[in-house]
Amino acid sequence: MDIKKSLGLAIQRSRKARKITQEDFSEVSSRTYVSTLERGLYSPTVEKVDAIAKVIGIHPLTLLTLSYLIESNDTDSTKILNQIQIELNQLLL
């Protein structure tokens, strides 16, 4: 699965888990645009990912991490979060 589709699924799953409708994004985006994102037809900008995550009530990195877990068909976030922690520590030195 490509990253556009997995990000779309991450948005959709997060939205549904929080019982948010596509219409609830009206302050940041149209329902049609959210639908196209969820179907993996478009790639949102970083600003749009941030805005969408705020509406859902999660950190943007949670949304991105979930999308990579979906892409790799993995449900264990421990490995990817450990990798991120190691890489952040290396980059921040």
Q: What would you call each of these model-derived segments?
A:
Residues 18-36:
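Short alpha-helical DNA-recognition segment
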Residues 41-54:
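Short, basic-rich loop-to-helix N-cap that marks the start of a DNA-contacting helix
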Residues 29, 38, 48, 67:
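DNA major-groove recognition helix of helix-turn-helix
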Residues 1-17:
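A short, Lys/Arg-rich alpha-helix, primarily the initiator
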Residues 7, 61-66:
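Conserved short hydrophobic patches within well-ordered secondary structure
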Residues 66-93:
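Short, charged recognition helix plus adjacent turn
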Residues 11, 22, 31, 46-49:
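Helix-turn-helix DNA-binding elements, focusing on the entry/boundary residues of the two helices
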